[in-house]
Amino acid sequence: MPHTLWMVWVLGVIISLSKEESSNQASLSCDRNGICKGSSGSLNSIPSGLTEAVKSLDLSNNRITYISNSDLQRCVNLQALVLTSNGINTIEEDSFSSLGSLEHLDLSYNYLSNLSSSWFKPLSSLTFLNLLGNPYKTLGETSLFSHLTKLQILRVGNMDTFTKIQRKDFAGLTFLEELEIDASDLQSYEPKSLKSIQNVSHLILHMKQHILLLEIFVDVTSSVECLELRDTDLDTFRFSELSTGETNSLIKKFTFRNVKITDESLFQVMKLLNQISGLLELEFDDCTLNGVGNFRASDNDRVIDPGKVETLTIRRLHIPRFYLFYDLSTLYSLTERVKRITVENSKVFLVPCLLSQHLKSLEYLDLSENLIVEEYLKNSACEDAWPSLQTLILRQNHLASLEKTGETLLTLKNLTNVDISKNSFHSMPETCQWPEKMKYLNLSSTRIHSVTGCIPKTLEILDVSNNNLNLFSLNLPQLKELYISRNKLMTLPDASLLPMLLVLKISRNAITTFSKEQLDSFHTLKTLEAGGNNFICSCEFLSFTQEQQALAKVLIDWPANYLCDSPSHVRGQQVQDVRLSVSECHRTALVSGMCCALFLLILLTGVLCHRFHGLWYMKMMWAWLQAKRKPRKAPSRNICYDAFVSYSERDAYWVENLMVQELENFNPPFKLCLHKRDFIPGKWIIDNIIDSIEKSHKTVFVLSENFVKSEWCKYELDFSHFRLFDENNDAAILILLEPIEKKAIPQRFCKLRKIMNTKTYLEWPMDEAQREGFWVNLRAAIKS
């Protein structure tokens, strides 16, 4: 019994492992380029069976806890390995020994509490390494990165347990493009730990407290080009004179991101920035100012010249006591050399006139996503304000009048570029005043319905995209670039109004087509973006777009964004792939050809009808149909005549003087029906023929050469034949007045041929001695 239980347990384990392995394989997908993706697949281990064909492996967001020596042994060509957000707590020493080609390694946000230099020693090609978010306290007992000579981007540290930076941590690293250190809970920093790195393009430093900030600053000031401080509370920061003895600083840009600061500490920070002689750019992103704008220095403090700072950027600045914020006058003197200022989404509603006048070197001002209205803008753009300003961006403020906005900016004599997009202007006056040097105007997303002479004639670039325009008919002789996408235009603008146009972007309008002539009329056009319209793929449009090889050089979004909207059977297809049938593309020629063919067919039919008596056949067919439509007579018909005589008018002498005399004068006499004598006047001839045949016991046909030439004789023969077969009545009697060869009978007398082949006929004898027998036989035939 124990043995059986043991076997069952072993089998269960094997089956479980087999299912797990199968699940791992199913969660991994690889393409032909060796890019394998298995993220968020609930994997418990690295899938087996990985080969040298794998070049990129993404296993992020799984449940992998262990990496063994054999997991990646065969992946000798692996270039990128992403294992972020797993539960990895153990990596065997030689797990990466075969990854000499690996360039990108991401082990962030796992459970690695101890880092080993043996992991990274074989990774001679590594350029990117991310170790963020693992619960290690230090970066190991020995230098981890000394063998990574090609490393360019390094990210280390965590928010909670990484408390110590040692001098050996970054030994061997000489150049990095980006170094990110999450030292949020840093408690110990060994001097010169970061000084060993000779050059860092961008250093990102996460620090909750500022206690060790100055020590780190001393080490990096001569090696870092861009210093970024994140998540730091500088409310109580105090600057102390640095005893470094160094005057050369490499830092060109200093960024404060998600930093807390006060009026007093901001003054202290500025004293720190004074130590950076080469500082050109200062940036504050998502920061909080716990102050009211009181930046006055104490008697013992003095802010020295800010140096060469040219660019100031402030984004999403939060001021809790915004309603008490009152003064910037102490900073006026520090702004005279600044050339570029961006204050975005920070509730700015006014730039004091005095501050504007101090910004003498300002060339670029971006006040996007604020609260500016025309009245306050007029105060900001007062006389002598921003004398060097060339570019003004007031995107997404509260401007409502184009006319007032233009007049307000007249004081800015050097202004050339204005962006007032995403304001709600709705309408545009007929005329406006703008600075004389205006070259660029952005009116996109301003809800305007038309463009007028308010647009300055001096413009070289105009953006009116994402509005409600259905017509553009402005004469702008100097315009080189026109952005008019996402409107309601149905055709390209008139090229004669835009003689200098180089770039036209008119995508996502209501344009259905454009022609070669339209494009050729833009003599200087180099770039056209017209995709996203509902194109009618007519033959002319397709021929133009598919035959013009140079068109692809002009249409920058060709062919992906050019789709057919009609005809319906090609809707959604790319214009370059659509092929229409000959009938769709040459309809006029096809109709003309069909008409010609129909005319020839009618002509040929007429010739054939004339040659083969087709008209005669049609008349006969009509008579036949008329006869078929007549109501069927009852079997016991009202017989009025013994015989109806069908004969040619040229044989009337024989019929009237011989046949009639012989039969009607016989005792008992026969009553014959002759058309000359018995047809009812005023009645249709065909109806007379039909009625006479139906009222006669027999029908006598007097056959001769004259008979076969008579149309009416043919009708009488046809109706008699109809009676013969339709009523099963043997009523036809043939008299051959003169010999007729069957070959001489016309084709239209087909029924006569049939009757002569199936019935005996009486032949008029030339010998008078035999004529008595002829009359006897005829009388007998009529009586039968």
Curated annotation (Swiss-Prot):
Checking Gene3D superfamilies in the record gives: Ribonuclease Inhibitor (3.80.10.10), Toll/interleukin-1 receptor homology (TIR) domain (3.40.50.10140)
Can you say where the LRR repeats lie in this chain?
A: 54-77, 78-101, 102-125, 126-150, 151-175, 176-199, 200-223, 224-250, 251-278, 279-308, 309-337, 338-361, 362-388, 389-414, 415-437, 438-457, 458-478, 479-500, 501-524
- Cytoplasmic topological domain residue ranges: 609-784
Glycyl lysine isopeptide (Lys-Gly) (interchain with G-Cter in ubiquitin) crosslink: positions? Answer: 754
Site note Interaction with bacterial lipopeptide applies to 349
Gene Ontology cellular-component terms for this entry are:
Golgi apparatus; membrane raft; phagocytic vesicle membrane; plasma membrane; receptor complex
Q: Which domain of life is it from?
A: Eukaryota
> What does the subunit section of this Swiss-Prot or TrEMBL entry state?
Interacts with LY96, TLR1 and TLR6 (via extracellular domain). TLR2 seems to exist in heterodimers with either TLR1 or TLR6 before stimulation by the ligand. The heterodimers form bigger oligomers in response to their corresponding ligands as well as further heterotypic associations with other receptors such as CD14 and/or CD36. Binds MYD88 (via TIR domain). Interacts with TICAM1. Interacts with CNPY3. Interacts with ATG16L1. Interacts with PPP1R11. Interacts with TICAM2. Interacts with TIRAP.
Give the protein's biological function.
Cooperates with LY96 to mediate the innate immune response to bacterial lipoproteins and other microbial cell wall components. Cooperates with TLR1 or TLR6 to mediate the innate immune response to bacterial lipoproteins or lipopeptides. Acts via MYD88 and TRAF6, leading to NF-kappa-B activation, cytokine secretion and the inflammatory response. May also promote apoptosis in response to lipoproteins.
**Which comment does the entry carry about domains?**
Ester-bound lipid substrates are bound through a crevice formed between the LRR 11 and LRR 12. The ATG16L1-binding motif mediates interaction with ATG16L1.
The molecule here is called: Toll-like receptor 2
Organism in which the protein naturally occurs: Pan troglodytes (Chimpanzee)
Q: What is the lineage of its organism?
A: Eukaryota, Metazoa, Chordata, Craniata, Vertebrata
Q: Source gene?
A: TLR2
